[in-house]
């Protein structure tokens, strides 16, 4: 875990810049995201995929009550990592913005427009006294009238569009997997397998009941939550692939030792 540099008093208010031009409260908010659950988003040729490891810490928790992927509109879905309460506030605001757009303009809001509105809210909370930044990152994705879109929002209000990305504690490992395995021509089914493969590398054991997953396909342009049974099938396929890779690596190592 990256150590935070002493702030020398410049972290006492959100509106104070350090001599290096840093806003420490924003950096602390990013630290909350780095400690959050891992979420993966992948843009495919026929849709988009979101998957989150809900990281259940107790057998007494009702898994169905832990939600990490939220439907914003018929065609937009979002995954969160960071402070749960902050997520609830921004998700409610995102849903409100989507409905206001339908009422005002008679059409669905685009993924980019919604992402920008959420980032405007996040940015406002970095420059007003008496408030703090949202300790939360969002992956906002969906299908609009243009194409599949996938955006990542930062606690500072920064907005970046990706082909595939990850947020949360497992981001570094998941990004390595995505950078090496991602293919722009992969299907949604292949994207679901890659998303779970990336998550499997960030945890000791990938349990289907702990995974939250949703897709939006070009054909229907509607958010679809993936069932636990379907996730279980994909997880089994992922672990078969992992076992095959480990066997191949062991074989190659043995051949090198012989040489």
Curated annotation (Swiss-Prot):
PROSITE patterns the UniProt entry points to: PROTEASOME_ALPHA_1, PROTEASOME_ALPHA_2
Gene Ontology biological process terms, A to Z: proteasomal protein catabolic process; ubiquitin-dependent protein catabolic process
Gene Ontology CC entries for this record: cytoplasm; proteasome core complex, alpha-subunit complex
InterPro entries: Ntn_hydrolases_N, Proteasome_alpha, Proteasome_alpha-type, Proteasome_asu_arc, Proteasome_asu_N, Proteasome_sua/b
Regulation: The formation of the proteasomal ATPase PAN-20S proteasome complex, via the docking of the C-termini of PAN into the intersubunit pockets in the alpha-rings, triggers opening of the gate for substrate entry. Interconversion between the open-gate and close-gate conformations leads to a dynamic regulation of the 20S proteasome proteolysis activity.
SUPFAM superfamilies: N-terminal nucleophile aminohydrolases (Ntn hydrolases)
Keywords noted in UniProt: Cytoplasm, Proteasome
Main location as per UniProt: cytoplasm
Domain of life of the native organism: Archaea
Family: Belongs to the peptidase T1A family.
Known function: Component of the proteasome core, a large protease complex with broad specificity involved in protein degradation.
HAMAP family (alphabetical): Proteasome_A_A
Protein name in UniProt: Proteasome subunit alpha
Gene name, Swiss-Prot/TrEMBL: psmA
């Amino acid at each position: 875990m990256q150590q935070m540099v002493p702030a020398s008093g410049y972290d006492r208010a959100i509106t104070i810049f350090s001599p290096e031009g840093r806003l420490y409260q924003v950096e602390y908010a990013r630290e909350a995201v780095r400690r959050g659950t891992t979420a993966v988003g992948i843009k495919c040729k026929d849709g988009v995929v979101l998957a989150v490891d809900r990281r259940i810490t107790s057998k007494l928790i009702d898994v169905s009550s832990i939600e990490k992927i939220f439907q914003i509109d018929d065609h937009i879905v979002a995954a969160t990592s960071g402070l749960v309460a902050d997520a609830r506030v921004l998700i409610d605001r995102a849903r409100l913005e989507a409905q206001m757009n339908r009422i005002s303009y008679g059409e669905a809001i685009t993924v980019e427009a919604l992402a920008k509105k959420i980032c405007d809210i996040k940015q406002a909370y970095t420059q007003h006294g008496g408030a703090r930044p949202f300790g939360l990152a969002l992956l906002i994705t969906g299908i609009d009238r243009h194409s599949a879109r996938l955006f990542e929002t930062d606690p500072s209000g920064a907005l970046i569009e990706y082909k595939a990305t990850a947020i949360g504690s497992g981001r570094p490992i998941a990004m390595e997997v995505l950078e090496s395995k991602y293919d722009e021509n992969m299907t949604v089914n292949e994207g679901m397998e890659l998303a779970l493969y990336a998550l499997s590398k960030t945890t000791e054991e990938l349990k289907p009941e702990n995974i939250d997953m949703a897709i939006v396909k070009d054909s229907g342009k509607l958010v679809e939550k993936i069932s636990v049974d379907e996730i279980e099938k994909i997880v089994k396929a992922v672990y078969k692939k992992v076992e095959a890779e480990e066997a191949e690596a062991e074989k190659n190592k043995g051949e090198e030792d012989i040489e």
